[in-house]
C-alpha cells in the first residue's frame, strides 16, 4: 500500500477522507468524448470534460431545491443513521461513499452518527461502471477497519448499474455479505440494502456536480494504485458542499429522533420496483431503438446530469409542469432537445434522458 496524504477536497477535515489521487489530465470535448465512448476507443473513465460553471439560473434552482428539500433531507438522514446504529449496535460504522454522488449523503450520515455517539469513519472511494470498485482504496479501508462495519453509500439509484458493479466487485473479496450493504437516500430502482424512500425526487445535491461534492471531478481509472480525480479549482467560487451539509445539520438538530418513524424497507416492495424498472428500460430501449442500456439514464438526478455532461437525444418527463424537473427541462431546451411528456409510461421515474447515438 502506497502512503498518501489525507485528501478532503473542500470538505472540513474529519468529514471525509477521499481515497483518490489528485491528477491533472487534458480535457476532452463533450462531443469528442461521446464519439470515443461509443466507438469503444476509450472508456468514459479514461477521460474528463471541463465541468462548466453553473449559470445563475442553475444556482437559483439549486438553492430553491435546498430550501424545499432541507427538512426532508434532515429527517431522512436521521432515519438512515438511526437504522444503521440499530443494525450495527456497538460496532463502529465505516461509511464508504461512492464518488461523487454518494459523498454529500455520506458526510451528512457521518455527522449524524457521531452526534448520536456512534463511532463512525467516512471515506470517498471510486467505483466505475464496467470496471468495478477501486480495489486499492478498499485495501486501505479493510487494513484499517476490517470488513464487518463497512457500508457503501450512494445518493440514489437509477437503473441499478452501480449495485451490479458492487456485487461483482465484492463477491471474490472475503468478509462481505452476498447483498452489498448499499445505503441510499432514494431507491426508485429497488436495488439497495437500505433506503430512506423509493421516491424519484429533486435531491438538491443530485443536480449539481463538483461544487456540491467537495470540488472534485468524476473519478479517473487507474490500473495501479488509487483511482484519480481532478480538483475543480475553476469552480471554487461556486463551492457549496459545506453549505449544504451545514444547512441540513441545522434542521437535523431541531428534530426529536425518537418521534421519527423507523424506516420500512422490505424485499417484496423492492422486487416490484426492480421489475418495473426493468420494464421501463426495456420499453424505452425498444421504442427508441437504443442498442445499449448504458445510454438510458432514468431518474431526475441521472437524467439531469446526463444533459449536463453528455450529448442527449431524448428527454422524457412524467409531467412537463412538475417543478422538480424544471432544471432538466430548461437545460434540454437550451441544447435544442425536445422534451416529451410521457405520463405513467415512465413507471416510478419522473424523468429519463437517452444519450444520443453519435456513430
Model-flagged regions — what are they?
Residues 103-112:
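Contiguous, well-ordered alpha-helical segments that form the cores/surfaces of helical PPI scaffolds
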Residues 1-93, 114-359:
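Long, low-complexity, Lys/Arg-enriched
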Amino acid at each position: 500500500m502506497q502512503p498518501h496524504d489525507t485528501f478532503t477536497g473542500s470538505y472540513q477535515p474529519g468529514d471525509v477522507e477521499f481515497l483518490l489521487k489528485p491528477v491533472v489530465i487534458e480535457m476532452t470535448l463533450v462531443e469528442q468524448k461521446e464519439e470515443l465512448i461509443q466507438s469503444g476507443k476509450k472508456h468514459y473513465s479514461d477521460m474528463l470534460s471541463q465541468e462548466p460553471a453553473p449559470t445563475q439560473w442553475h444556482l437559483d434552482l439549486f438553492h430553491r431545491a435546498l430550501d424545499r428539500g432541507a427538512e426532508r433531507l434532515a429527517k431522512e438522514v436521521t432515519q438512515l443513521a438511526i437504522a444503521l446504529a440499530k443494525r450495527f449496535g456497538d460496532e463502529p460504522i465505516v461509511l464508504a461513499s461512492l464518488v461523487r454522488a454518494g459523498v454529500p449523503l455520506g458526510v451528512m450520515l457521518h455527522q449524524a452518527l457521531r452526534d448520536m455517539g456512534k463511532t463512525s469513519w467516512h471515506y470517498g472511494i471510486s467505483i466505475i461502471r464496467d470496471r468495478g470498485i477501486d480495489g486499492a482504496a478498499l485495501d486501505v479501508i479493510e487494513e484499517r477497519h476490517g470488513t464487518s462495519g463497512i457500508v457503501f453509500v450512494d445518493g440514489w439509484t437509477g437503473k441499478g448499474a452501480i449495485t451490479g458493479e458492487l456485487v461483482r466487485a465484492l463477491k471474490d473479496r472475503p468478509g462481505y455479505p452476498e447483498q452489498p450493504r448499499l445505503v441510499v437516500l432514494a431507491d426508485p430502482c429497488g436495488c439497495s440494502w437500505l433506503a430512506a424512500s423509493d421516491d424519484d425526487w429533486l435531491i438538491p445535491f443530485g443536480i449539481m456536480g463538483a461544487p456540491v461534492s467537495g470540488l472534485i471531478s468524476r473519478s479517473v481509472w487507474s490500473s495501479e494504485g488509487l483511482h484519480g480525480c481532478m480538483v475543480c479549482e475553476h469552480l471554487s467560487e461556486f463551492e457549496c458542499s459545506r453549505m449544504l451539509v451545514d444547512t441540513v445539520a441545522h434542521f437535523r438538530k431541531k428534530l426529536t429522533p425518537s418521534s421519527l418513524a423507523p424506516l420500512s424497507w422490505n424485499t417484496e416492495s423492492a422486487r416490484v420496483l426492480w421489475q418495473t424498472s426493468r420494464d421501463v428500460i426495456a420499453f424505452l430501449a425498444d421504442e427508441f431503438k437504443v442498442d445499449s442500456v448504458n445510454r438510458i439514464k432514468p431518474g431526475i438526478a441521472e437524467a439531469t446530469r446526463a444533459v449536463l455532461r453528455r450529448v442527449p437525444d431524448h428527454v422524457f418527463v412524467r409531467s412537463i409542469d412538475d417543478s422538480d424537473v424544471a432544471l432538466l427541462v430548461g437545460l434540454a431546451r437550451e441544447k435544442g432537445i425536445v422534451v416529451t411528456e410521457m405520463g405513467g409510461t415512465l413507471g416510478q421515474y419522473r424523468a429519463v434522458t437517452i444519450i444520443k447515438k453519435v456513430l
